[in-house]
Amino acid sequence: MANLWNDLISKLPNPHFLQTHEWGQVKAKYGWIPYYAVWTDDGKFHFSQTTDSLSLITGQCVAAALILKKQVLSQGFAARLSILYAPKGPLLDWKNEHLRDRVLNDLQTVAKKQGAIFLKIDPDIVLGRGVPNNADDVPDDAGQAARSELMRRGWGYSSDQIQFQNTVLIDLSVPVNEMLARMKPKTRYNIRLAEKKGVGFRVGGVGDLPMLYKMYAETSVRDGFVIRDENYYKTVWRLFMQSTIHGQPSALPLIAEVNNEPVAAIFLFMFAGRAYYVYGMSRNIHREKMPAYLLQWEAMKIAGANGCAAYDLWGAPDVFDESDSMWGVYRFKEGLGGEVVRTLGAYDFAPNKLWYKLYAEIMPRVLDVMRSRGKEKTKQGLG
């Protein structure tokens, strides 16, 4: 039934790999319960823990959402309380006011019935394109209207943004030579430099996963960000690598090598005509040979060959200047010739404002402790 769900959501506006059956199965291994919500054109709303009943739905699907549920506590007075999250969902035509009202009404009812402290959504609703306050800044009126509707209904901009709100999107529908032409000259130069310096490239396999995690851990320690344990990433990578959606692989590890030694890698995810650069990693050696540039160029060509019309580089700054921690990464992505896309971000609906306030105050402290422990554990793992 996994393919049935994926087929269903792939026909909706802005389908995303974080809404796939595979992502629900990944999260199910780590304490989340996946629910599958479907709205049909006959006015019915289907909400189930499994996808088994999808084949029985008679109406045409007009909206859908993978909704993840997690209990806050396993016992005690708050054992019934939960949090709900629809990553990059719900999927629907947000310009359709009647459908939008219907979906939001049902989601708010679900949040109340499930005893949720909050329900978080972060659909790919575009608020604007280009860097804010620059000549290429183009606001999106439909996106602005959807945001206003959420706020009118009592949904609040979340202090806990799980996904990147802004990103860089590369158009893969143009010929390869035009993709190159859209890049900054320095980026094209670095791609040629990598080739000249003997940087090789290959598509990896499941056997490479231990090596790739070690490289990712090395990157996290060097660049100062926190990662999860090895089993988590192996679960995500293996599940998507072994899954095919519409005949194409869902994820590919792309590995750059110097003298047959891996020096950098990225994971390329693909779903419903869009590719995603989700995980990037590199060794501390041979960085002057620019393997990261060659990898992105190969990723663009592979994604295009697999029917993807766009490549999401997964993240751009909140503030477009050097004060933002993502500024350096953004300059690299900008050089690849993409367009900045600014989206809605995450909004929360909180049925119980008191519990929501308590959760919002306590959880950041818990996460700070967990991040500190996570950094130390990763360092120890590298020896």
Indicate residue ranges for each PLM-predicted region.
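Short Gly/Ser/Thr- and charged-rich N-terminal loops/segments
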Residues: Q49-G59, G247
